[in-house]
């Protein structure tokens, strides 16, 4: 049972809180690969750190508590978490994915799981009526991001979960962009939640990790087996870093999102900006749905400049904001999805779903917002062609 109903408190005290033996307020780092056994069949509950480690177990209990699941699982990366979840499916199964998802998710489905007989199809998950008609006997799951990467498309998670339950299939939600502080998909009917914990949960661009949570005991047993069998687990030190990062998630996201809301309004009013993608703007696609299922619009913004602006010059001129892969750290980061995060998606598919060569994705940090805006403004001014 959780110590509190409030997530702000759960972030700090949820899961396994400290060390009961020594009284240490932080979970110790059990930097060990194996555990001494008193005799044959006589262990302390720990045998080998791929199978289980006390530091990792504390993290797994914490994310289960935060998402409202029965079990959590920690992996060496977000893609390790996603791949282990996808390993639940078998030859002949098909998974419906959102029309814009992280390029790594597309790549592992297209280049790895397709070769193993697990196929996928891309659908507009915002159109529930049409989505319902796309479920054929071979479809076994929906895999959704909301807001989606990189266009921040919002999907009605409860609506999709209802369709999934009607057809007896699973709903898997990548909750990386929102985290359980802003959105809890299991409460909306999802069966499995995955995270690239590298992002907001870690929050400091110093750890690569992935998490999965389920509220279904049968799925939890299968995931536990596959986690151990596949072996892409998170080490104890990285587990400790993630626990530490999660403690400040609430205060960080409060600043992230406060900054993002102001920057989105600034970009929306800028004469050089053609389009702003941000779920927190009243005219955004899915604004009302996002308001219903999430605390706010999050801290990711994508935008496009009008013709006559050279985005290469924009990126080059930035001083405070770093051009880099990833997102969700305390520092502001910007990227070019077409050639970076979504480069593995064929150009014709990218263009069809709206990921243009002119799209810019901004991960809003927690710096003074005025400084971020000044840097964006300098970049836009430098990008204007004579």
What is each residue range found by the language model?
Residues 2-3, 13, 73-272, 277:
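Conserved PLP-enzyme active-site core in the AAT-like
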Residues 29, 38-58, 65, 333-358:
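Glycine-rich phosphate/pyrophosphate-binding loop
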Residues 242-251, 298-306, 361-365:
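Short, well-ordered beta-strand elements within core beta-sheets of diverse protein domains
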Residues 34-83, 87-88, 104-111:
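Conserved N-terminal alpha-helix of the aminotransferase class I/II PLP-enzyme fold
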Residues 230-231, 318-328, 379-386:
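A common structural junction motif
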Residues 261-319, 323-325, 345-351:
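Conserved small-domain helix->loop->beta segment predominantly found in fold-type I
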């Amino acid at each position: 049972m959780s110590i509190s109903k409030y997530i702000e408190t759960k972030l700090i005290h949820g899961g396994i809180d400290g060390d009961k033996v020594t009284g240490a307020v932080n979970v110790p780092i059990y930097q060990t690969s194996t555990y001494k056994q008193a005799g044959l069949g006589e262990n302390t509950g720990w045998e080998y750190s791929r199978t289980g480690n006390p530091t990792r177990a504390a993290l797994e209990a914490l994310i289960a508590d935060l998402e409202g699941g029965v079990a959590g699982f920690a992996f060496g990366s977000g893609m390790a978490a996603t791949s282990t979840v996808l390993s639940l499916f078998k030859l002949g199964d098909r998974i419906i994915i959102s029309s814009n998802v992280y390029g790594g998710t597309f790549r592992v489905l297209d280049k790895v799981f397709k070769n193993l007989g697990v196929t996928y199809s891309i659908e507009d998950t915002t159109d529930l009526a049409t989505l319902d008609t796309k479920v054929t006997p071979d479809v076994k799951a929906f895999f959704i991001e909301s807001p989606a990467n990189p266009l921040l498309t919002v999907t009605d998670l409860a609506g999709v979960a209802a369709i999934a339950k009607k057809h007896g299939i699973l709903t898997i939600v990548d909750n990386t962009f929102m985290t359980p502080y802003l959105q809890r998909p299991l409460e909306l009917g999802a069966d499995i939640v995955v995270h690239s914990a590298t992002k907001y949960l870690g929050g400091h661009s110093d750890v690569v990790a992935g998490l999965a949570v389920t509220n279904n005991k049968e799925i939890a047993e299968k995931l536990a087996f596959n986690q151990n069998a596949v072996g892409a687990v998170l080490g104890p030190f990285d587990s400790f870093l993630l626990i530490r990062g999660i403690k400040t998630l609430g205060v960080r996201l409060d600043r992230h999102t406060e900054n993002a809301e102001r920057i989105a309004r600034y970009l929306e009013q800028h004469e050089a900006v053609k389009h702003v993608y941000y779920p927190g703007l009243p005219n955004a696609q899915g604004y009302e749905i996002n308001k219903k299922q999430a605390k706010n619009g999050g801290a990711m913004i994508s935008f496009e400049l009008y013709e006559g602006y050279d985005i290469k010059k924009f990126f080059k001129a930035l001083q405070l904001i770093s051009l880099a892969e990833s997102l969700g750290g305390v520092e502001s980061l910007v990227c070019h999805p077409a050639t970076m995060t979504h480069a593995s998606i064929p150009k014709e598919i990218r263009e069809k779903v709206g990921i243009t060569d002119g799209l810019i994705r901004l991960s809003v940090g927690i710096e003074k917002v005025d400084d971020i805006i000044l840097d964006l403004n300098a970049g836009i001014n430098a990008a204007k062609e004579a």
